[in-house]
Every structure is written in structure tokens, then in C-alpha cells.
């Protein structure tokens, strides 16, 4: 996708490609969790790709992945109740526009059920979620070709840029509430700590 042509340019977020890294980070934070839930929206075409990548990564870590397919907000409570019934030790929330809109409810349900969860955007731990890992928004915006377009370059001549900087954000207050001690090795790699 170096030069997609037409009027297309921008920055790829790599939401599917970095999902296994989120699983790895959650495994490092909660190594005793042998069953991890994955919240995905089945109406999102990327969901199947995310599930496939995470199932492969989960096998490598000796983790069983439990897939929760939720496409409407009213199904969130029952999805979290099923996590508890299945003894799920942690949760990955897929990057999904509707989940981002529902983030306060998702964070509240994770806290209510004492389920450590990792998310795809820093806004989740900023709002009380445990952890996020994603391409740096600030770095991505700096890479965007908008400024070049405003200077007269044509979008057709600009590549779609892959992110080069990723950020790990951990909310220590939430970790403490969940009785999770963040390993020093993970804390040392954290880009932003929320206390």
C-alpha cells in the first residue's frame, strides 16, 4: 500500500496486526490467566482476522481463548456475566468503533466483575480501564500527509504510512483495585502510567 492511488493516503492503524502483542502484554500482566476472553463485533469484517491471529498467539502461550461476539450495547452485561461463569481470567477488547463509544460501560463492567482488560486505545485507561497498547496517535498524526497536501502535493503521490511508534498505557489505580501487581519489567516499558 505504498501508493494506493486516487485521493487515498493516510496512516494505517494496524489494529489487526498488533492484537497478538496485546495478548502477550496481558499474559505478562496476568500470567495465571489460562482462559482469556476476546470481545469482538461479528459485524466488523476485521473480527475474523483478529480472532484467527489471536487464536494462533493464544496457542503459543498455552492460553485458551473464549470469543464473545457482541454487536449491540444491550448484550454487554450478559457477555460479561458469561465471562465470570466460564472462569475467564482476563479480557481483550477488540478495536471497534462501537466499543469505543461504549467504553465507559465496558470499563465499568470489567471493574464490577474484577476482570483485567486490555484495550486498543489510550482513552480506555484514561477513563479507568487497566491497560492499552496501540499505535501512538500523536506520532501517527505527525506522519499524516495532510500538511503535504496543504502545501500542494497530490494525494496520489503520498504513501499510506505504517505506524512506527506504539504506546503502552497502564492505569495503576485500576491495577491496584484489581489486586494486580504490575511486573517491574512491564512497568519499565510503559509509555504512560496513570496513577
Feature names for model-found ranges:
Residues 1-195:
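Short hydrophobic alpha-helices and adjacent helix-cap/hinge residues
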Amino acid at each position: 500500500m505504498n501508493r494506493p492511488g486516487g485521493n487515498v493516503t493516510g496512516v494505517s492503524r494496524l489494529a489487526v496486526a498488533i492484537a497478538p502483542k496485546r495478548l502477550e502484554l496481558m499474559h505478562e500482566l496476568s500470567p495465571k490467566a489460562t482462559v482469556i476472553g476476546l470481545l469482538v463485533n461479528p459485524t466488523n469484517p476485521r473480527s475474523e482476522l483478529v480472532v484467527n491471529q489471536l487464536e494462533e498467539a493464544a496457542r503459543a502461550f498455552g492460553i485458551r481463548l473464549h470469543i464473545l461476539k457482541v454487536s449491540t450495547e444491550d448484550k454487554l452485561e450478559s457477555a460479561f456475566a458469561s465471562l465470570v461463569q466460564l472462569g475467564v481470567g482476563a479480557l481483550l477488547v477488540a478495536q471497534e468503533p462501537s466499543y469505543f463509544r461504549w467504553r465507559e460501560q465496558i470499563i465499568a463492567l470489567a471493574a464490577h466483575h474484577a476482570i483485567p482488560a486490555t484495550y486498543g486505545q489510550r482513552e480506555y485507561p484514561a477513563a479507568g480501564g487497566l491497560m492499552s497498547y496501540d499505535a501512538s496517535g500523536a506520532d501517527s498524526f505527525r506522519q499524516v500527509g495532510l500538511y503535504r497536501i496543504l502545501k500542494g502535493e497530490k494525494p496520489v503521490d503520498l504513501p499510506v504510512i505504517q505506524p512506527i511508534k506504539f504506546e503502552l498505557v497502564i492505569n495503576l489505580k485500576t491495577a491496584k483495585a484489581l489486586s494486580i501487581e504490575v511486573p517491574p519489567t512491564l512497568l519499565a516499558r510503559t509509555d504512560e502510567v496513570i496513577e
